[in-house]
């Protein structure tokens, strides 16, 4: 069901601009992200049933995950089509694929709802924290289902609730309190928009998928200091930077300082942070 809280065209345009801007940060932090999120990519590929020779679609692939993981599993007889709304993120994905020596990937710039492939084009589909950003997640899932062969599986990821995802919850809750921003209405797309098994499983069910299953996975992210954590968030997380953007620079600076202090509450004696984050993985059959 398309979100009633945002204008879809406006929202997707803002997403494109924000993620194009964030691509520089993803280049800088990709190793940190890969180390933490790699297990999610591997499990999604497994849940989707990707095997040698598989034809795979990755929706909202960003910088190329889980596309690259899937491409390695599909092998030279398989293929992966990685799609994303951001040209800059895809450009980095192409570079990463080339550096990994993977020649079985194709990158296409498109939002999820506009994808168009013939029926039975793919054996499996994936989306790691991607389709949850679409204003019409169920509609996008239905389109993906139409591209899959009968019985093909679509495996997707979302984040849990803010208190179980400190990487996002700490900065987002701090910023919203500091700036007196009310919680977004239910159905507003974003990283924390599908925080329960019912919500993320419902996206697939709403898209017509059957035999939907949901599981949890814990992903740990390490930072040498609270300051480094704040820098990380500023450079890779458009949903949070967008909260601050409308405010004067001094207010933004004060809010980032408050985020650093909130993060410091999670620090160990040496000042470093180890944040365990709950992700939800869902899979359904076409």
Where are these regions (language model features)?
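A short acidic, Gly/Pro-enriched loop at the edge of an enzyme's catalytic core
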Residues: 113-124
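Conserved Class I S-adenosyl-L-methionine
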Residues: 2-18, 25, 29-30, 34-37, ...
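A short SAM/SAH-binding and catalytic strip from SAM-dependent methyltransferases
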Residues: 123-137, 160
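Class I SAM-dependent methyltransferase SAM/SAH-binding core
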Residues: 55-115, 139
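Conserved hydrophobic residues forming the short capping helix/wall of the S-adenosyl-L-methionine
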Residues: 74, 97, 175-176, 204, ...
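Conserved alpha-helix/loop element of class I SAM-dependent methyltransferases that forms part
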Residues: 32-54, 69
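Conserved catalytic/acceptor-binding region of the Class I
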Residues: 138-139, 145, 149-224
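Short glycine-dipeptide loop
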Residues: 52-53, 76-77, 148-154
């Amino acid at each position: 069901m398309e979100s009633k809280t945002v204008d879809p065209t406006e929202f997707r345009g803002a997403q494109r601009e924000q993620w194009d801007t964030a691509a520089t940060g993803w280049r800088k932090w990709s190793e940190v992200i890969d180390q933490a999120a790699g297990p999610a990519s591997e499990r999604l590929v497994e849940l989707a049933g990707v095997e040698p020779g598989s034809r795979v679609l990755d929706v909202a692939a960003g910088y190329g995950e889980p596309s690259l993981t899937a491409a390695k599993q599909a092998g030279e007889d398989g293929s992966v089509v990685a799609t994303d709304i951001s040209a800059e993120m895809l450009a980095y994905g192409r570079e990463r694929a080339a550096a990994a020596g993977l020649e079985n990937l194709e990158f296409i710039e498109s939002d999820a709802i506009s994808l168009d492939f013939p029926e039975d084009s793919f054996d499996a589909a994936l989306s790691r924290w991607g389709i949850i950003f679409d204003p019409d997640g169920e509609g996008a899932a239905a389109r993906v289902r139409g591209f899959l062969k009968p019985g093909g599986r679509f495996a997707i990821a979302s984040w849990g609730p803010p208190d179980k995802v400190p990487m996002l919850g700490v900065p987002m809750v701090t910023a919203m309190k500091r700036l007196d921003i009310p919680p977004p209405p239910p159905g507003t797309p974003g990283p924390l928009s599908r925080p329960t098994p019912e919500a993320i499983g419902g996206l697939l069910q709403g898209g017509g998928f059957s035999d939907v299953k949901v599981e949890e996975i814990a992903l740990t992210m390490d930072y040498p200091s609270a300051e480094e954590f704040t820098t990380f968030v500023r450079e890779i997380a458009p949903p949070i930077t967008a909260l601050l953007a409308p405010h004067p620079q001094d207010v933004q600076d004060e809010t980032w300082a408050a985020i650093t202090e909130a993060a410091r509450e999670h620090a160990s004696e040496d000042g470093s942070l180890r944040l365990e984050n709950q992700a939800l993985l869902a899979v359904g059959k076409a």
